[in-house]
Every structure is written in structure tokens, then in C-alpha cells.
Amino acid sequence: DWSDPRTSNGDDINGGMSKKYYEYNKMVWANQVSYKISIARDHHIDALVGYEIDDQYRDYLSGYATNFATHDKNQISNGMKTESVGGNDTRTRMVSYLTRLNYDYKNKYYLGGSFRTDGSSRFQRDNRWGSFWSISGAWRIIEEEFMSPTKDWLTDLKIRASYGVNGTLPSDYFGYMGLSSLTNGYLEQPGIIQSQLRNDDLQWETNYNLNLGLDFALWNRINAVSYTHLRAHE
């Protein structure tokens, strides 16, 4: 941003230029293998295993200079007084191993399960990995023989439930580290201060989720879903 010395925004500082640069790169490498099989036409199995890498890089640079010799040479390097220069760069990575298995019998009874292990650079080595899982089941009641009299108007009816554990990353990229910062202290003398205490106990936030649902359809035209979600944190 340019504060022109010929205007009220820049006349008292003889012109000012502020520059900011931000770069963000994200690389995701995902590999999955799935397998489906039907046994005796009534048993259906769907399996999956996978491996993922998430690599994110952020680079930030800023500068502000004032006192320019002429208004038409306003590159920040032409400012005679450097008011501020700052910048930082961060890189975070996460590696994940995952698997999933689903089974159903005659499209009537459903069972499922999943498991994954995630390792993140946002934690110190001993707490880097977290393991999470879920199980699920469903019953398509409309496929039962005793539901035959209702099929003229009730064309689908299914109840389902799932329970599982997932993890949440901390918002800080280096929250577990003890950090120090450079600063201009008394009489603008340089110094070092502690900006963050070391936290070896920082771990994955664990969330326990229970989901209950009821799906039904009327006359093959009206579809409805009733859903309940309960969550607990640790």
C-alpha cells in the first residue's frame, strides 16, 4: 500500500510503502485399494485400505518503509527509513493409515467398521500418533416379511446407528514447543524473551460420537430422515 507524500495520508512521513507477501502450498498424496465381493449372492463385503500424506507450507513476509526521495520511485527499497520488517514460514505434515470394512446381508442387515492411525507434526514425538475408530449398523425393516402389508404406502424404512472416536488437531502449529522471540526492549536494545512455554502433554483432542437415524419413504415420493447426534470431548 502506497501513502503518497502529496496527500494527507503520506505528507507527514514523506511517503510510505507497505508490502506483504503470502504463499501457501498444500500437497496431498492419497493411495487407496478397495475390494468388493458377493458370496452366495446374499452376502456382500466391501473392504478398503489406504495411506495418506498431507504436507502444508506457509511463507509470510512483510515490510514498511517511509521517507521517499520522490513520489514516482515508490519501491519499498527506495524508502530511506525502514519502519518494520517481518516474516515467518511454517511447514506441517500428517501421515495417515486407514482401513474400512462394510458387510450386508440381502441388503437388509448392515455392519461396518473403520480404523485409522494419524501422525501429526503438531505434537511432540511421544504424543504424535492417535488411533481412531468407528462401528456402525443398520436394519432395513421394510425388507422383512411382516412389513409386506405396508409396502403399498411405506416404501422404505431403515434404522441405523453408529459410534466412534475421532481426533482434532490443535490450532497452533508448534503448541508443544518452548519458543523464544527477538524484541526491542528498553531504549530499543535487542533482547530475547520467552514467548511460549514448552508443553509436553499436548495431545490429540478426542471426540466420542453417537449417531442414531431413522430413514423412511412414503409412496416412493416422500423421503424423510430423522437424525440424532451426540458428542463428548476428552
Q: PLM features: residue spans?
A:
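Short, flexible, mixed-charge acidic loops at enzyme active sites
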Residues: 2-6
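Extracellular/periplasmic, surface-exposed regions of secreted and cell-surface proteins
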Residues: 1, 11-230
